[in-house]
Amino acid sequence: MKFATNKKIINEIKTDCLMISVFNDGKLRGAAKLVNNANGKLIDDFIKNKDIQGKIGQTRIIPVTGKSYKRIVLVGCGKFEDFSQKNYRKAIASALSKISQTNHKSVVSLVHDGAEKIDNPNKAYRLSRVLAESWHSISYQYTTTKKSNLRKLDLRKIEIGTNGKKAIKDLKTGLEHGDAIGKATKLVRHLGDLPANICTPTYLVSVARKIMNKNKSATLKVLNEAQMKKLKMNSLLSVTAGASEPAKMIVAEFNNGSKSQKPIVVVGKGITFDTGGISLKPSNKMDEMKYDMCGASTTIGLMQMVTELNLPINAVFVVPACENVPSSTATLPGDVVTSMSGTTIEVLNTDAEGRLILADALTYAQRYKPKLMIDMATLTGACVVALGAHHSGLMSNSDQLADQLFQCGQSTDDVTWRLPLTEDYANQI
């Protein structure tokens, strides 16, 4: 997909589809009003006949003649007074999804009306970034082992229109960032959707290596089981004890900041399949346990985004990857292992394996003396029970970091909710 800005006036815009905003009060504003006037107030008729009511997610495609654009796409944006980045994202995603079902190859978005209500000082950046992210979100489809019923996507170019010179730079940056974030998110989803017989720890290594080889500031180190044993990572090795598929510890270093800058360390849980081990899970929906590596896939996606944008930071991405399966060599309930930190751990339930691999990964990551450490994991379904499907659980021993991550979630519509992590829980940990 090619993303670009378009500085031409409305009557000179050449595209298959021209997207404009329609709110539920029926009042056309800004660009929508100009497009309506240029087309004999055609849109007024659609609103009057209630062919478009301005509801979020409602989209209508109108053919026009005698213009440099072939179609006008009416994008429902809800209540004008409630317009927000979240509603804009929903509206844009719905419109792009509708357009992707046609054979149109290009689109220019003029869905700017109401942008002043977006709660962010850099509104141009937000509009363009969300536009690019939304395309990647709606265009993702799993194809590796599925060949039928796939959507044919003809759309090749998405532009965002502007008549302001000052906004061009911010719009371009937003498109660049949104494209990189969108592609990284697609990778995360793809790795999660792959079956466990393809997405093994070794496969994750190959994906990470391909990413890191593209950037001269990036290096990759992979620890095998013998190296982990030498480092006394017995907590992690106890989880993989029953598996024939070898465990891997991916350590990807990205040094593009100053030498004095302490790195940010990201650790992602990579259980490529979790049967529960000897403490076997119920068979119903066990196939979904291929998603127990989504902490790892998110870490690898973040790795791709950071290296593609060549961000001026130092970062280390650590992925402990293995399978948790039962066999005659598997760890048994009641076994005691000693972690890399020297802590002895009694394994009462082998289905509590996430904390075991993360314990050694977090201990190993400390040798980088990080500025901060972020751990991402599908650690327990109890978090979903507590928060539902809309918020990610956030726990931190730093109020400042927790606040920053919370604000990041708010500004990107990927929201978190902080859960307690106090001394009161120490005995249970």
What are these regions (language model features)?
Residues D51-Q53, G57, V205-I429:
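A generic structural signal for tightly packed, nonpolar segments enriched in small/aliphatic residues
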Residues M1-G270:
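Short amphipathic alpha-helical segment within the helicase RecA-like ATPase core
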